[in-house]
């Protein structure tokens, strides 16, 4: 059994802030935990514009707090998000998140991230193998 709190993750190597300071992700479960997925609490700053493309991962996102827009860049669709909204990037969609207020979300990645990934110039996490 694994039990962790965000308080014990804060300000450790599992607490990642983007280079531009727009988002912060607390990586609660990572690939090294060997459970087949990773689980993160992510906050995104109000008024920021954030483009992502998880070409190597499926991501499920549950919005806990905040409001904003999700733009599907592959299909030119705009979705209004609020507490209780969920989106699943099962088609590896390129997308943009534009928070109107600070957003706090819970995210699940498959395959799991290791915690060392950095978004490349296209917003993609590379696929990093988890050591056996």
UniProtKB/Swiss-Prot annotation:
InterPro entries: Ectoine_synth, RmlC-like_jellyroll, RmlC_Cupin_sf. Pathway: Amine and polyamine biosynthesis; ectoine biosynthesis; L-ectoine from L-aspartate 4-semialdehyde: step 3/3. GO terms for biological process: ectoine biosynthetic process. GO terms for molecular function: ectoine synthase activity. It catalyses: (2S)-4-acetamido-2-aminobutanoate = L-ectoine + H2O. Signal peptide: none annotated. Its EC number is 4.2.1.108. Keywords: Lyase. It is an enzyme of class 4 (lyase). NCBIfam families: PRK13290.1. Catalyzes the circularization of gamma-N-acetyl-alpha,gamma-diaminobutyric acid (ADABA) to ectoine (1,4,5,6-tetrahydro-2-methyl-4-pyrimidine carboxylic acid), which is an excellent osmoprotectant. PANTHER family: L-ECTOINE SYNTHASE, PTHR39289. Belongs to the ectoine synthase family. This is L-ectoine synthase. It comes from Rhodococcus jostii (strain RHA1).
């Amino acid at each position: 059994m694994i039990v962790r709190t965000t308080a014990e993750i804060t300000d450790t190597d599992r607490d990642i802030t983007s280079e531009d300071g727009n988002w912060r992700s607390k990586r609660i479960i990572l690939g090294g935990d060997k459970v087949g997925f990773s689980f993160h609490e992510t906050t995104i700053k109000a008024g920021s514009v954030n483009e992502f493309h998880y070409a190597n991962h499926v991501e499920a996102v549950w919005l806990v707090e905040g409001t904003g827009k999700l733009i599907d860049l592959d299909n030119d669709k705009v979705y209004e998000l609020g507490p209780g909204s969920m989106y699943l990037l099962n088609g590896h969609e390129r997308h943009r998140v534009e928070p109107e207020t600070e957003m706090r979300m819970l995210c699940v990645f498959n395959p799991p991230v290791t915690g060392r990934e950095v978004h490349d110039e296209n917003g993609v996490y590379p696929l990093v193998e988890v050591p056996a």
